[in-house]
């Protein structure tokens, strides 16, 4: 019998019942909740007279709607009435149903996909869901993690189970070592550039190879975070010493003998040598440059040394039309050099790149430099109150402020136009977030996806520049 993939092992460990129609009931170990996709789920419980099946399996925090300034005012500092109501409703629901919530004034508050791992609420081998498509982030820990819809949030609250269909197995192997200045963000953008935004549809992607093994947990989280942008609901990395070291000693992590038993199990969470994948994609990590997205889809990406494509050279009429439309929306010209793209704003943050390593990388680039006078704004938004505190302990906040960047409070911020942080029409933004479709960061806003180091380099020059030139 052929060996099992990591995904096969995780699926089998959580399988409650296989059904005749091909669907299956799987057990969920952890559910993360935020203010946008949970209100109707709680209301459904209320109307049915139900209570959460396992209260301690759920953790909540507000993130999408919270302001990143004036946080001392708490909920009263939320100007938009809809945003304020959503945060108030989360507080009310968690209080009523006894669910642990890191509220707006709690230092542990932050973006849901940042706080899970930093609290040790995300542990290897778990099945993890959240009403948010970027739940794939947690797969970096050898977890079966994916986003779900609001009705499914209610289902998990009520039963701790979920009806799913098993996906196919895909291995994305990044061979060789990454060059200086090349990060996990560049790797995942290069992967999406190669396989496209539908390349992973129907698959659970395991990321492997020397380049992936060499990444920190922060780098691996960035890659798994953007699995969904490659079309895959699930992305994962096998457990190794890096994983175990990161999890050790965190508030929700096991202790004592339980820890030893857990580690013994966690070390089995890798694909067997003879496991068979339905699809295998390989990349040369040493050939990956710092990446910049130029269009309105994450697959519209190119190395910083490259140029915007020329639609006249595209033979596929559908792709050609897509390039023409993207160029028009983005206000770019065919064959325009990436380094000639001028910027209006820079955003360093989001569930993709707002962890301490991301902030250290950005700070190293801006240290001793100043934000370009041509920029309207450059902002840094830490992913949680604890990330913010650690950054301030290391003096990173002073580095950013002295360079002219705004140092904000934690939240989803400018990743999406759901709070006060937005782009104006026609503005170009170097953003460390994960999506660049039309209007994502604000009506008419033009998003360029980059790493924190590349965003920092753009902040001090006013246009895209190869960050490796600033590192020498």
Swiss-Prot record:
SUPFAM superfamilies: Aconitase iron-sulfur domain (SSF53732). Its cofactor is [4Fe-4S] cluster. This is 3-isopropylmalate dehydratase large subunit. Keywords: 4Fe-4S, Amino-acid biosynthesis, Branched-chain amino acid biosynthesis, Iron, Iron-sulfur, Leucine biosynthesis, Lyase, Metal-binding. The keyword Metal-binding applies. Pathway: Amino-acid biosynthesis; L-leucine biosynthesis; L-leucine from 3-methyl-2-oxobutanoate: step 2/4. Pfam families: Aconitase. Heterodimer of LeuC and LeuD. It comes from the Bacteria. Belongs to the aconitase/IPM isomerase family. LeuC type 1 subfamily. It comes from Marinobacter nauticus (strain ATCC 700491 / DSM 11845 / VT8) (Marinobacter aquaeolei). Binds 1 [4Fe-4S] cluster per subunit. It is an enzyme of class 4 (lyase). GO terms for molecular function: 3-isopropylmalate dehydratase activity; 4 iron, 4 sulfur cluster binding; metal ion binding. One of its GO terms (biological process) is L-leucine biosynthetic process. [4Fe-4S] cluster binds at residues 351, 412, 415. It catalyses: (2R,3S)-3-isopropylmalate = (2S)-2-isopropylmalate. Catalyzes the isomerization between 2-isopropylmalate and 3-isopropylmalate, via the formation of 2-isopropylmaleate. Its EC number is 4.2.1.33.
């Amino acid at each position: 019998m052929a060996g099992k993939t990591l995904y096969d092992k995780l699926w089998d460990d959580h399988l409650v019942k296989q059904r005749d129609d091909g669907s299956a009931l799987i057990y969920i170990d952890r559910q993360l909740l935020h203010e946008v996709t949970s209100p109707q789920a709680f209301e459904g419980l209320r109307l049915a007279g139900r209570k959460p099946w396992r209260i301690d399996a759920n953790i909540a925090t507000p993130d999408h709607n919270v302001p990143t300034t004036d946080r001392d005012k708490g909920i009263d500092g939320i100007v938009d009435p809809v945003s304020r109501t959503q945060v108030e409703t989360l507080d009310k629901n968690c209080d009523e149903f006894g669910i642990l919530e890191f509220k707006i004034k709690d230092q542990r508050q932050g973006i849901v996909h940042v706080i899970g791992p930093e609290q040790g609420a995300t542990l290897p081998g778990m099945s993890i869901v959240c009403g948010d498509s970027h739940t794939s982030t947690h797969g970096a820990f050898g977890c079966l993690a994916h986003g779900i819809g609001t009705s499914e949030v209610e289902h998990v609250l009520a039963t701790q189970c979920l009806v799913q269909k098993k996906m196919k197995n895909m291995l994305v192997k990044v061979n060789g070592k990454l060059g200086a200045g090349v990060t996990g963000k560049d790797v995942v953008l290069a992967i999406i550039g190669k396989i496209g935004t539908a390349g992973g549809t129907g698959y659970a992607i395991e990321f492997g190879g020397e380049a992936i093994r060499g990444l920190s947990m922060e780098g691996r989280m960035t890659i798994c975070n953007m699995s969904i942008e490659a079309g895959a609901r699930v992305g994962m990395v096998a457990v190794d010493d890096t994983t175990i070291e990161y999890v050790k000693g965190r508030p929700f992590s096991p202790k004592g003998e339980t820890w030893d038993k857990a580690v013994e199990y966690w070390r089995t969470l890798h694909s067997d040598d003879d496991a068979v994948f339905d699809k295998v994609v390989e990349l040369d990590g040493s050939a990956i440059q710092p990446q910049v997205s130029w269009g309105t889809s994450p697959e519209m990406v190119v190395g910083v040394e490259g140029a915007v494509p020329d639609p006249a050279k595209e033979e596929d009429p559908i792709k050609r039309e897509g390039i023409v439309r993207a160029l028009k929306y983005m206000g770019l010209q065919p064959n325009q050099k990436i380094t000639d793209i001028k910027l209006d704003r820079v955003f360093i943050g989001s569930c993709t790149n707002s962890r301490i390593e991301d902030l250290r990388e950005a700070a190293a680039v801006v240290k001793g430099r100043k934000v370009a006078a041509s920029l309207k704004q450059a902002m840094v938004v830490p992913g949680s109150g604890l990330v913010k505190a650690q950054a301030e302990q290391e003096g990173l906040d002073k580095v950013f402020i002295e360079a002219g960047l705004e140092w904000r409070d934690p939240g989803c911020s400018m990743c999406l136009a759901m709070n006060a942080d937005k782009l104006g029409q026609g503005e170009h933004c170097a953003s460390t977030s994960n999506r660049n479709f039309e209007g994502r960061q604000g009506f008419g806003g033009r998003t360029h996806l980059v790493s924190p180091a590349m965003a920092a380099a753009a902040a001090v020059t006013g246009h895209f520049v190869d960050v490796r030139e600033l590192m020498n």
